[in-house]
Amino acid sequence: MIDVVEIQKILPHRFPFLLIDRVVELEPAKNIVAYKNVTIGEPIFQGHFPGHPIYPGVMIIEGMAQAGGVLAFKSMSDEHQAGIENKVVYFMSIDGAKFRHPVRPGDRLEYRLNVLKHKGNIWVLEGKAYVDDVLCAEAELKAMIVDK
């Protein structure tokens, strides 16, 4: 639905910190499904952990936040979409983060986020991350869209 080229028009993140490759579902102001292909070539695996590579939980949470940012931007009204290049999403809080299953090179990490609450420029999202339908991580995220 939204490829990495389009994602880069929405988010300011770039390699090695752009953590979503594609959006496969998006219902504005409701939910998003996006994924990242985790590869052994990721710079993070040089130190986490040599000989036993595990994708860090903090990177999973950041990927969720980036997917949430795409959802928030794509949920903006048409008149606000025109000024998207002058906006940025700031992470406000993470609550209830839990890491349930390790993510390894070769995994397709799928982010599923649902809007719990939205008021003005503030978004509260329930995020879950899966590999092959196995829950790997979950958290409640709060973010806001602001001018750059």
Curated annotation (Swiss-Prot):
Q: Where are the transmembrane segments?
A: none
Top-rank lineage group of the source organism: Bacteria
Which InterPro entries does this chain map to?
FabA_FabZ, FabZ, HotDog_dom_sf
Q: What is its main location?
A: cytoplasm
Task: Write down the SUPFAM superfamilies for this protein, in alphabetical order.
Answer: Thioesterase/thiol ester dehydrase-isomerase
Which EC number applies?
4.2.1.59
**Compartments where found:** Cytoplasm
Annotated catalysed reactions: a (3R)-hydroxyacyl-[ACP] = a (2E)-enoyl-[ACP] + H2O
What are the record's GO terms for cellular component?
A: cytoplasm; membrane
GO MF annotations in UniProt:
(3R)-hydroxyacyl-[acyl-carrier-protein] dehydratase activity
The UniProt keyword set, sorted, is: Cytoplasm, Lipid A biosynthesis, Lipid biosynthesis, Lipid metabolism, Lyase
GO biological processes: fatty acid biosynthetic process; lipid A biosynthetic process
**Active-site residues, Swiss-Prot/TrEMBL:** 48
Supply the enzyme class, top level.
Answer: lyase
Known role: Involved in unsaturated fatty acids biosynthesis. Catalyzes the dehydration of short chain beta-hydroxyacyl-ACPs and long chain saturated and unsaturated beta-hydroxyacyl-ACPs.
Similarity comment: Belongs to the thioester dehydratase family. FabZ subfamily.
The protein in question is named: 3-hydroxyacyl-[acyl-carrier-protein] dehydratase FabZ
Q: Which organism is it from?
A: Campylobacter concisus (strain 13826)
